């Protein structure tokens, strides 16, 4: 099937979806209606561009016909040639745009995310770097107009982060931050280092799409829910009423503890959001591991432990190892200006997928 057959198939499906979404039987089925609505929304831009492309093709035909019928009239011929030139230029631009729009879409791109950051190898320095990454993502989220909510955090004795879980909400969050999963390495002189030696530490980042209850059902029988008293610094109980919640997904032993909120229900709701995302992500990773290597993400190996980026403080340098990008502006990037890296990763991914599409 060539690109134009694919585009026509997308338009045909779009029109079919429009009819289905006005069917009372579909409207009454919330789950199906939501799925079809998302499918329609995901193809809307492609269909609009394809229809514009067909209009441009018609303009080219009309201009060529006008030239033939100009009857030697130089004014009409010149006008038709100018229209033809503009239409052909627009045709090339739309062909490039349509190729990009035909690339397989990640169904999670428009979703909010659950962001997890952990200090890994390097002790206190790794925990401090995890805090730097948290601040970087918070500032980037602010620049994008997203909402950033820390849901759970644990700190070490020097103010570094052992682990933090955050919800980032807004437009197309996952599409921009999905490439951040992996090991982030830092090279710098710790404040406690008296001889000026550079130490290397790592923090790990995990980005998971938020999973709505209607998208992924967890059998209540597979969950163990424990209620206990929230504890403060030093381990003392800070609530007379048991408000802290621990949820364990028994088949995978994935567990979430939540005690940030003042009520049991709010802690339970937040814990369910996280465990739903983790369980869905767990099984998505298993499914991905079973796919052929060509079908895995084109950026990196997809291995969560893969070192994806190095932040070198002495050289003010950031290197993304997956695409060979080096920027001498570490201070700028840690201040939340991630756009250059994000754009480069998105472009690289699209380029690889376009090459694959052209080779089919």
From Swiss-Prot:
**Where N5-methylglutamine occurs along the chain?**
236
| One cellular component (GO) term of this entry | cytoplasm
Q: Which domain of life is it from?
A: Bacteria
Keywords, ordered alphabetically:
Cytoplasm, Methylation, Protein biosynthesis
Q: Give a GO molecular function annotation for the protein.
A: translation release factor activity, codon specific
Per its UniProt record, what InterPro entries does this chain match?
PCRF (IPR005139), Pep_chain_release_fac_I (IPR000352), Pep_chain_release_fac_I_sf (IPR045853), Prokaryotic/Mito_RF (IPR050057), RF-1 (IPR004373)
| Composition-biased stretches (Basic and acidic residues) | 293-308
Which modifications occur after translation, per UniProt?
Answer: Methylated by PrmC. Methylation increases the termination efficiency of RF1.
Region feature (Disordered)? 288-308
Q: Which positions form S-S bridges?
A: none
List locations, semicolon-separated.
Answer: Cytoplasm
HAMAP family from the UniProt entry: Rel_fac_1 (MF_00093)
Q: Could you say which protein family the record assigns here?
A: Belongs to the prokaryotic/mitochondrial release factor family.
Its job: Peptide chain release factor 1 directs the termination of translation in response to the peptide chain termination codons UAG and UAA.
Q: What is this protein called?
A: Peptide chain release factor 1
Which species does this protein come from? Streptococcus equi subsp. equi (strain 4047)
Task: Quote the gene name from the UniProt entry.
Answer: prfA
